[in-house]
Amino acid sequence: MPPRKAPAKRRSTDSGVERDRGALSQEKKDQRIALFLSDFDQQAKESIREMKKELDLLLQMAEKAFMVELLKMPTAIRKMKRKDLLNLQEGEEVALAAAATDCALEDVPSPKVTRTNSKKVKVTTIVEYEDAKYTSTKKIPKKVSKSKSLVSLSSGLNSKLHSLSRSVYSSTSVNEAVKTPASDCSATNFKAMPKVSKSAGLQQAVSRTVPTSERVQGMVLRSKSVPQDKMVPFVNIPLADGQTLCMAGGDLRNIDVQLLNQDTVQHIHNLVVSLNQQTCIPTHSSTLSCEINVPGADSSCVFLLRLRNTSD
């Protein structure tokens, strides 16, 4: 029988590659686990932070509610010690609770309606006054509160316009009455009459302060008190009570200037300066009639001045 051959050694199919793959897969697993744990730690920390924030908010709300309840309690209970409060008997606790509720109701301030000053708006309306020979425009400022309605504003403006229209009518009647006594003057007097119309704007402002009946009465008295002699200077000053102060001739030099208002003296000075600066005064003897509105010492008044101009 032939001898058996020894079994040949098998070649190992493991060349070391499988070990490397196993080591790499194990490292990847370790890395994934480490990343998962770190992510878990971060999420846990974030959740803890959110819970702390919510807890802080709850504590703040509790403190605010506690402070509100303390403010509702009377001062005596707030100053009381905890031991004294705990040692109270049942009856005293009931009385204390009732007193606390009463004080809480009494401490609540009753609502009071207060009215504050509203802002004022300055409204400016322009009203035109028409005369036969001259037209003047006057601005009338009026302060109206914001709280007022538009109806009240329009009614106030209508009443103001109505009163102004009456003053214009009365001022034109006064102008006509002033022109009548001077109608018998020379032709140069008619040339000087436009000065009367130029002062209509001032006269309208005066006519608003004096009633219509008093203005008509003063106009009649002025027309009667005019001296017959055209060459004599005169001054008529209507007073606040309806009477008229008449001065003519030498009495004009005896006027006490201290009794007049400072504005009156200034207006008279301006009148004299304007008359001295005129260059179109006729050379022959004539009488110059003019009218000027001057505020007096106690009320508004009208000066009628008749000046004589004589040539050399």
Curated annotation (Swiss-Prot):
Q: Which GO terms describe its biological process?
A: cell division; mitotic sister chromatid segregation
Subunit comment: Component of the CPC complex.
Q: Where does it live in the cell?
A: Nucleus; Chromosome, Centromere
Annotated stretches, region: Disordered: 1-26
Q: Which domain of life is it from?
A: Eukaryota
The record lists the organism as: Gallus gallus (Chicken)
Q: Which gene encodes it?
A: CDCA9
Family membership noted in the UniProt record: Belongs to the borealin family.
**UniProt feature, compositional bias: Basic and acidic residues:** 11-26
Instruction: Spell out the InterPro entries in the cross-references.
Output: Borealin_C, Borealin_N, Cell_div_borealin
* Composition-biased stretches (Basic residues): 1-10
Task: Give the UniProt entry's GO cellular component terms.
Answer: chromosome passenger complex; chromosome, centromeric region; nucleus; spindle midzone
The protein's role, per its UniProt record: Component of the chromosomal passenger complex (CPC), a complex that acts as a key regulator of mitosis. The CPC complex has essential functions at the centromere in ensuring correct chromosome alignment and segregation and is required for chromatin-induced microtubule stabilization and spindle assembly.
Q: What is this protein called?
A: Borealin-2
Q: Which UniProt keywords apply?
A: Cell cycle, Cell division, Centromere, Chromosome, Mitosis, Nucleus
